[in-house]
């Protein structure tokens, strides 16, 4: 590969990195199971593909806007100093244009290939993350990721709306599951990178509050998440199979966070990133259970 080819490949990698692909992957993980539950069976594959592509562009646009807005503070944090706007791989102007292009294309995509409600929800999701979280909340309140987490819940509503053309109670419960899951997911991260957040004056809970208090709140939110997953049983008429899965997964999730809390109370060293990673697994398995239940209920 010549110099031009390598340069082009680096540019592509930089633009992909700008979209925060790992976050996109996590958001899309909730999409297919939600569509299966809404359909009470396997939806049209083309419909699923359309929603996944639109969702990837929407989430990618939100990530790109966030990288543009946070480019100054990203340079001060070890976790983010390799992002393309910090390294100079992309210019701020090019990044902003790319973010707007993805945003507009994602909304038009949903409008043309899915429906108007998912297009509207997609636009709201980008606005919530790029403006409400990144500009209004992030530097102002320790509750930033709680309310900023609203954006991360939107793929569930988009997926449900794509199938039904409406927002129903099961979708709202799933929305609440992701909303309540967000603090137990991100606050352990803020504990691990507390020094980074202090250097940038971002008031993340894990950076400015005592660890004992932070982990206690993580534990309380974990109980709330589990309660919400169980609430789905009567609301969405889930089968006993889902009830068993959600109860076992919930007990495991709460137990692991309780173990972390005990270590903090006793003054021991903690590995907060263990809970960060574990929370990803927990949410993945909960939504996998939702998808399985949607297929099983069709067969009963």
Swiss-Prot record:
Segments traversing the membrane: 21-43, 45-65, 94-114, 117-137, 145-167, 171-193, 213-233, 235-255, 272-292
CDD domains registered for this protein in UniProt: PT_UbiA_Cox10 (cd13957)
Record function comment: Converts heme B (protoheme IX) to heme O by substitution of the vinyl group on carbon 2 of heme B porphyrin ring with a hydroxyethyl farnesyl side group.
Miscellaneous: Carbon 2 of the heme B porphyrin ring is defined according to the Fischer nomenclature.
Natural source organism: Tropheryma whipplei (strain Twist) (Whipple's bacillus)
Family: Belongs to the UbiA prenyltransferase family. Protoheme IX farnesyltransferase subfamily.
Principal cellular location given in the protein's record: membrane
Cysteine-cysteine disulfides: none
Descriptive protein name: Protoheme IX farnesyltransferase
Pathway given in the UniProt record: Porphyrin-containing compound metabolism; heme O biosynthesis; heme O from protoheme: step 1/1
EC number: 2.5.1.141
PANTHER family on file: 4-HYDROXYBENZOATE SOLANESYLTRANSFERASE, PROTOHEME IX FARNESYLTRANSFERASE, MITOCHONDRIAL
Keywords from the named record: Cell membrane, Heme biosynthesis, Membrane, Transferase, Transmembrane, Transmembrane helix
Molecular-function annotations in GO: protoheme IX farnesyltransferase activity
Record flagged with keyword Transmembrane: yes
EC supergroup of this enzyme: transferase
Places the protein is found: Cell membrane
One of the protein's GO biological processes: heme O biosynthetic process
Mode of membrane association: Multi-pass membrane protein
CC per GO annotation: plasma membrane
Keyword Transmembrane helix: yes
Reaction(s) the record says it catalyses: heme b + (2E,6E)-farnesyl diphosphate + H2O = Fe(II)-heme o + diphosphate
